[in-house]
Amino acid sequence: LLWFYGHNIFGLLLTPMGLAVAYYVLPIATRSPLWSHSLSLIGFWSLIIVYTHIGTHHLLQVPVPTWLKTISIVDSVAMVIPVMIVLINLWYTIKGKLGEIHADIGAKFVLTGTIWYFFVNIQGSMMALPHVQRITHFNNWVVGHAHIGVLGFAGVTALGGLYFILPKITGKPLYS
């Protein structure tokens, strides 16, 4: 149960909150509409559907039913689909607008968070493969992967959201 709970804290709580910040900040900072509203819905709901089953990929070497291990491996690899849907949508929204991103410190943080999101999810899908996991699971690779997700993606994106929204709330600019 720990892996379902612990893994889903990141995937079903921190990830949607981080993506909500990105979906809010990037279109406003670039003064451009979201590239595709339909893709945002597909990305969100496919994330919710696929992510709920991946906690068992940390238990491939223990006596857990094979069907559960198989579902977790398939869904872990399938996470590439919702992640790329979300990132393509966000990155196409800011396409040609990097000057506006560069001018806003909050948007820079959020864009950096989306890059970390790409890396942590590609890494996670790869780490769920049994042949890779036999090598990486009982070392600090897994700890580093968790830190990239929580600090690299969720933390950097949250800081970007704060940097973006605080001047709007207070009416005063932030100086860096």
Feature annotation, model-predicted:
Residues 1-3, 64-75, 137-143:
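Non-cytosolic membrane-interface motifs at loop->transmembrane helix junctions
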Residues 133-135:
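Juxtamembrane/interface segments of multi-pass membrane proteins
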Residues 4-29, 38-59, 72-93, 107-130, ...:
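Hydrophobic cores of alpha-helical transmembrane segments in multi-pass integral membrane proteins
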